[in-house]
Swiss-Prot record:
Belongs to the apolipoprotein A1/A4/E family. This is Apolipoprotein A-I. The gene is APOA1. GO terms for biological process: acylglycerol homeostasis; adrenal gland development; amyloid-beta formation; blood vessel endothelial cell migration; cellular response to lipoprotein particle stimulus; cholesterol biosynthetic process; cholesterol efflux; cholesterol homeostasis. InterPro entries: ApoA_E (IPR000074), Apolipoprotein_A1/A4/E (IPR050163). Residues 1-18 form the signal peptide. Participates in the reverse transport of cholesterol from tissues to the liver for excretion by promoting cholesterol efflux from tissues and by acting as a cofactor for the lecithin cholesterol acyltransferase (LCAT). SUPFAM superfamilies: Apolipoprotein A-I.
Length: 264
């Protein structure tokens, strides 16, 4: 329980800013978040697209055109998956660069959090001991009440409720008092930790990771290299889709011509 209290207390002090430092997984980079959002969007479009295609192909116009959109959508999905697979090494390269450049900062923040955790440990131990003691006291007080519940008749329900209500209210008020006491004890360390985090963020804005000009040049170089490597992959992706796009266009033109003739 002590370990859980320590972790919850530090997260309470720092908010979500410090969450990744207490997890075994590596922190999610901006690139990770962008990739996840794109994947979710593509999956949503794919799912909704299949429903729309199924409705269209089952219609009279869809049957007449016989565009085989579902097959083409699967081909498009396969091509997109291959493009994503081909991009993976370059994405990994940029992500590793970001993690390397922020390693020193993350180490400093982890050290600050460890120091705060040690400072607040006595308060958490005290809170845990009081909480456990209170629960044990009320467990003992409720033991005879529980026995009465076994023999409870309908006529005694209100009487039993009258006995339980003040016990529950007292327990609630005393536990709230312990929580409030813990909050007051942790307040100075919360301010200290927030100040340190703000200071580190200010250092990033002023100095960069490492120096701003150096880091910017490195990022631009990486992006330029990435763009050069990605160009042939995107071109290949376009070439694979061209036949299906042309086929779709020709079928639509043919259908419109036939429709115009029938109207005329």
């Amino acid at each position: 329980m002590r370990g859980v209290l320590v972790t919850l207390a530090v997260l309470f002090l720092t908010g979500t800013q410090a969450r990744s430092f207490w997890q075994h997984d590596e922190p999610q980079t901006p690139l990770d978040r962008i990739r996840d959002m794109v994947d979710v969007y593509l999956e949503t479009v794919k799912a909704s697209g299949k429903d729309a295609i199924a409705q269209f192909e089952s219609s009279a116009v869809g049957k007449q055109l016989d565009l085989k959109l579902a097959d083409n959508l699967d081909t498009l999905s396969a091509a997109a998956a291959k493009l994503r697979e081909d991009m993976a090494p370059y994405y990994k390269e940029v992500r590793e660069m970001w993690l390397k450049d922020t390693e020193a900062l993350r180490a400093e923040l982890t050290k600050d959090l460890e120091e705060v955790k040690e400072k607040i440990r006595p308060f958490l131990d005290q809170f845990s001991a009081k909480w456990t003691e209170e629960l044990e006291q009320y467990r003992q007080r409720l033991t005879p009440v529980a026995q009465e519940l076994k023999e409870l008749t309908k006529q005694k329900v209100e009487l039993m409720q009258a006995k339980l209500t003040p016990v529950a209210e007292e327990a609630r008020d005393r536990l709230r008092g312990h929580v409030e006491e813990l909050r007051k004890n942790l307040a100075p360390y919360s301010d200290e930790l927030r100040q340190k985090l703000s200071q580190k963020l200010e250092e990033i804005r002023e100095k960069g990771i490492p120096q701003a000009s150096e880091y910017q040049a490195k990022v631009m170089e990486q992006l330029s290299n990435l763009r050069e490597k990605m160009t042939p992959l995107v071109q290949e992706f376009r070439e694979r889709l061209t036949p299906y796009a042309e086929n779709l266009k020709n079928r639509l033109i043919s259908f419109l011509d036939e429709l115009q003739k029938s109207v005329a």
